[in-house]
């Protein structure tokens, strides 16, 4: 049985376009094989921005922590445990002001940890999370794929690659604010991409 971690970053929760697409993908995946799904709504999780105080707890022994320090350490430790036990990561990724949502950046700051998910070596960083697959469902009001304005794709490939995850797949749902006809066509194309992905996921 595969463990599937679903991370939704839309401000609209389950009503967001990217969240709807991750839901459709997981539903279809459940029909093809036995999976265990762990779902995280990053908007309601309400992670604070990473602070120096929280980062300091990562190098502390749990027995030496105060209650407040233990609570800060738990942010990263719990998210890391979810990521490490997952086989497949499914991400609902809207675009806000040409970049990723701040809630997803807060998640990245907790899981991209030197000494845990990657290490620095004389030959450069070495990731520790090989063998996982990522599917990113990128919903956008305009059309950015393949242009300099698409900052998400290279950044997310870079940060997952840092952790050793190189099988990163993007499904684009673009032009959603460019008229009903264009949006419908984009949805159709995205759903067709789902059926193509499923055989490779099983």
From Swiss-Prot:
Cofactor(s), names only, from the UniProt record: FMN
Record bears the keyword Membrane: no
GO molecular function: electron transfer activity; FMN binding; oxidoreductase activity, acting on NAD(P)H as acceptor; oxidoreductase activity, acting on NAD(P)H, quinone or similar compound as acceptor
Pfam family, one: Flavodoxin_2
UniProt remark on cofactor binding: Binds 1 FMN per subunit.
UniProt binding sites for FMN: 10, 95-98
EC class: oxidoreductase
E.C. numbers: 1.6.5.-, 1.7.1.17
Database matches in InterPro entries: Flavodoxin_fold (IPR003680), Flavoprotein-like_sf (IPR029039), FMN-dep_NADH:Q_OxRdtase_AzoR1 (IPR050104), NADH:quinone_OxRdtase_FMN_depd (IPR023048)
Matches recorded under Gene3D superfamilies: 3.40.50.360
Keyword terms of this UniProt record: Flavoprotein, FMN, NAD, Oxidoreductase
Family membership: Belongs to the azoreductase type 1 family.
Known function: Quinone reductase that provides resistance to thiol-specific stress caused by electrophilic quinones.
Subunit structure: Homodimer.
Protein name: FMN-dependent NADH:quinone oxidoreductase
Taxonomic lineage from the root: Bacteria, Pseudomonadati, Pseudomonadota, Gammaproteobacteria, Alteromonadales
Name of encoding gene: azoR
